[in-house]
């Protein structure tokens, strides 16, 4: 392939393998080398999403037809007119960065948005994302349930779990609980189990050559076999926590059938309560070009016993062979994207709760243990005094608040009612009463929304203001574009000067307030501080976007 951007591509082991996975392989090679376009997912939970989409259109962005707005409850996918990470306009680069940092959009590869679309989440669902970091799919799951329900986003690696927390807060969602466990040994959740489960499994990533060109040199035919057992163990564990009637997606960004169809086949063999079902991809991602799952592929597994099934070879069972075409394969060349694999399962078991939650005996199920003492610094329900302070000081009622350190977090009701308060089974069959996180190691639940100081309520956080703004009844003041422009350019005015512009500030106590501005059919909620001066309390991303809305040119 002369002139190739990655000169080793046509000589790679991956190219050799792809030629054995599909007959018309040449178009794939041509499409698997150029850089991906920059793609974004718009957060549909934000009231200013129309403003965000106008700005993307002004930058030359276009909606991706098969990731249209409103389909399957997820935000629209957008394609920008530059290669991934190579925007040449500093102004456009700064705007997209600010939109991402403030949670209005999420940088995400287009095909990576497919699994959540096909999972079919609904408001109120209890969802598990077993391998959740860095969090693009986990936040997409929160969007898919309209932030009503619970998404348990699990990650085994501590550093990646912290990244997951950061992305949760960036997206501004209240329905996510971040946990840290080896996914193969995830504890039992309360009955009846999860309504939806996503297993976006660790994989070789050989479908990501357009963003990870080192794959061309790094990938080997043995790579998929080395991950097969881990992928299968994760999928099995997830299946055991899926309630009857619930649905589970297994997905990878790999093209290797050893990581995909071979895992699906082994899962169907070992979990007789699972059925592979039609993903309705043409309905949920209209216009996306896909291929069915493979039923034949080369394999060189070693079988030493006559009755042993080679887990790497194509299945011989007629029912599994008939089911595999229901899997979804996305190839790089057919959608100008990366590649992806998705399989959708349904729990068709006739039991009442998830398989892992079925008690070993009636006696064991009746055994109640006292809940363990909570870990230090864990989030707990806010004290009545804090809830009352939020109601009397700011006029906000009817929100679920948890407390840790100097922060109050807003949580979805389902986190408290099911994941915190629900009884849960122990490994030996006993039951624990609710009112704690145990046995889960919870890193963060909900959205930090209120700052406190020395136990006293201070102000709404900038991360939570988009949620709290419409609820606030006190300490909210209408402002003008003129005053906000001056504050962004020159800094905060003396409080006497601010009162001349905003008469309602007369008599306002010192401390945190919120300024409200109607601009371009959008409402801006701006945290500020009343002292000797009126000072904006905005992070850089919000300052930048407010400046854009006001027509200002601010330093990036």
Which residues fall in each region the model found?
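Polybasic, low-complexity RNA-engagement segments
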Residues: 1-61, 321, 336-341, 346-556
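Class I SAM-dependent transferase core
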Residues: 71-121
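Conserved class I S-adenosyl-L-methionine
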Residues: 124-133
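Conserved SAM-dependent methyltransferase scaffold
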Residues: 138-142
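Short beta-strand element of Class I
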Residues: 148-152
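S-adenosyl-L-methionine
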Residues: 154-191
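Mobile active-site "lid"/loop adjacent to the S-adenosyl-L-methionine
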Residues: 159, 192-237, 242-245, 249, ...
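Class I S-adenosyl-L-methionine
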Residues: 194, 247, 255-408
């Amino acid at each position: 392939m002369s002139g190739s951007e990655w000169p080793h591509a046509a000589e790679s082991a991956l190219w050799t393998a792809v030629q054995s996975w599909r007959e018309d392989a040449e178009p794939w090679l041509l499409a698997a080398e150029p850089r991906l376009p920059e793609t974004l997912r718009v957060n549909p939970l934000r009231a200013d999403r129309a403003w965000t989409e106008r700005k993307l259109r002004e930058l030359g962005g276009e909606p991706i037809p098969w990731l249209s707005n409103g389909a399957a409850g997820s935000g629209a996918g957008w394609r920008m007119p530059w290669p991934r990470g190579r925007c040449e306009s500093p102004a456009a680069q700064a705007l997209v960065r600010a939109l991402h940092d403030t949670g209005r959009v999420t940088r995400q590869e287009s095909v990576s948005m497919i699994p959540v679309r096909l999972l079919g989440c609904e408001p109120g669902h209890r969802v598990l994302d077993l391998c959740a970091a860095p969090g693009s799919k986990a936040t997409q799951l929160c969007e898919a349930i309209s932030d009503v329900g619970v998404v348990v986003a699990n990650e085994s690696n501590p550093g990646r779990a912290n990244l997951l927390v950061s992305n949760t807060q960036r997206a501004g969602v209240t329905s996510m609980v971040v946990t840290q466990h080896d996914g193969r040994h995830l504890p039992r959740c309360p009955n009846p189990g999860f309504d939806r489960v996503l297993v976006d499994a660790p994989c070789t990533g050989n479908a990501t050559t357009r963003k990870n060109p080192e794959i061309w040199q790094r990938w080997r035919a043995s790579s998929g076999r080395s991950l097969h057992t881990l992928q299968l163990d994760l999928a099995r564990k997830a299946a055991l926590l899926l309630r009857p009637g619930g649905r589970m997606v297994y997905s990878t960004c790999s093209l290797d059938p050893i990581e995909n169809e071979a895992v699906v086949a082994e899962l169907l063999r070992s979990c007789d309560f699972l059925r592979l079902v039609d993903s309705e991809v043409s309905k949920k991602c209209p216009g996306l070009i896909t291929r069915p799952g493979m039923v034949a592929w080369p394999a060189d597994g070693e079988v030493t016993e006559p009755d042993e099934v080679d887990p790497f070879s194509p299945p011989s069972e007629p029912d599994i062979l008939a089911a595999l075409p229901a899997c979804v394969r996305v190839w790089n060349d057919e959608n100008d994207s990366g590649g992806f694999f998705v399989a959708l399962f349904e729990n068709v078991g006739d039991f009442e709760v998830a398989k892992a939650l079925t008690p070993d005996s009636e006696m064991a199920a009746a055994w109640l243990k006292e809940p363990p003492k909570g870990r230090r610094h864990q989030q707990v329900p806010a004290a009545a005094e804090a809830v009352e302070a939020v109601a009397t000081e700011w006029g906000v009622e009817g929100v679920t608040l948890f407390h840790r350190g100097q922060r109050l977090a807003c949580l979805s009701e389902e986190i408290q009612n099911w994941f915190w308060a629900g009884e849960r089974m122990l490994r030996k069959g006993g039951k624990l009463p609710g009112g704690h996180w145990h046995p889960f190691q919870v890193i963060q639940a909900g959205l930090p929304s209120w700052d406190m100081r020395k136990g006293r309520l201070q102000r709404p956080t900038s991360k939570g203001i988009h949620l709290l703004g419409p609820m606030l009844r006190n300490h909210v003041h209408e402002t003008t574009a003129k005053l906000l422009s001056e504050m962004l350019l020159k800094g905060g005015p003396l409080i006497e000067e601010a009162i001349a512009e905003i008469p309602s500030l007369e008599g306002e106590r010192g401390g945190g307030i919120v300024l409200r501005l109607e601009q371009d059919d959008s409402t801006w909620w701006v945290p500020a501080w009343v002292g000797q001066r009126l000072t904006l309390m905005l992070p850089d991303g919000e300052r930048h976007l407010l400046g854009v809305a006001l027509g200002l040119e601010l330093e990036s």
